[in-house]
Regions:
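Binuclear metal-dependent hydrolase catalytic cores centered on His/Asp/Glu-rich metal-binding motifs
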Residues: 4-48, 65-74
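Short acidic-hydrophobic surface loop/beta-edge motif
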Residues: 1-8, 96-100
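Short, well-ordered beta-to-alpha junction loops that form the rim of enzyme active sites
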Residues: 19, 51-55, 91-92
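Short acidic, glycine-rich surface-loop motifs adjacent to enzyme active sites
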Residues: 44-61
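Conserved beta-sheet core of the metallophosphoesterase superfamily
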Residues: 60-135
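A short C-terminal boundary segment appended to hydrolase-like catalytic domains
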Residues: 129-175
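Conserved hydrophobic/aromatic beta-strand scaffold that supports enzyme active sites
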Residues: 1, 14-16, 124-126
Length: 175
């Protein structure tokens, strides 16, 4: 857990959690950790970020949907309840962005693995966060970048890039 001060003087709380289970593809946070998570986010902060390995919602284009954490519904409810703004994850190596219950859920690709899905190419996410917006950009090392989504934090409205839905097609390889 980190307490940081951002560029615009925003206070930031970042909590990272190990969701892995030995020898299993599925993950879990576990009810025994919920009170600890709640406590970490109890201090006032302008921005609250939660990071974990597994994703909390199924990722399109990844086949089997069994690789969310076992307690994903409870975890999403908890994170919404404690005012988390952003969840970061990446188990399936496929970038995607959702807005669920005022929580921006951002799944990342990978630049360090060859375990890619379909035509998804190596990438990582860049998040630019201000008091008004959260802009998510996919960066493709050495080959460019693509705007993924823009969250208006005042209206809590997500504006995803309509081309993102086609990222599983071969045409998505052009930045």
């Amino acid at each position: 857990m980190l307490h940081l001060t951002g560029r615009e003087g925003q206070t930031v709380t970042l909590v990272a959690m190990d969701s892995t289970k030995p020898d299993l593809a599925e993950g879990e946070i576990g009810r025994e950790r919920y009170s600890w998570i709640r406590q970490q986010f109890s201090a006032p902060a302008d921005l609250r970020i939660f990071a974990l390995h597994h994703h909390l919602v199924p990722v399109p284009g990844t086949g089997r949907e069994r690789n969310t954490v076992w307690d994903s519904g409870d975890v999403l409810a908890l994170l919404s309840d404690v005012g988390v703004n952003v969840v970061l994850s990446g188990h399936k190596h496929v970038p995607f962005v959702w807005l669920l219950n005022n929580v921006l859920v951002v799944n990342s690709g990978t630049v360090s693995s060859h375990r890619l899905r379909g035509y998804v190419r190596p990438s990582y996410n860049l998040l630019e966060i201000t008091r008004e917006r959260i802009v998510v950009t996919l960066r493709y090392p050495g080959t460019g970048e693509r705007h993924a989504a823009d969250l208006d934090r005042r209206e809590m409205r997500l504006y995803p890039n309509p081309d993102l839905a086609g990222m599983f097609a071969k045409s998505a390889w052009h930045a």
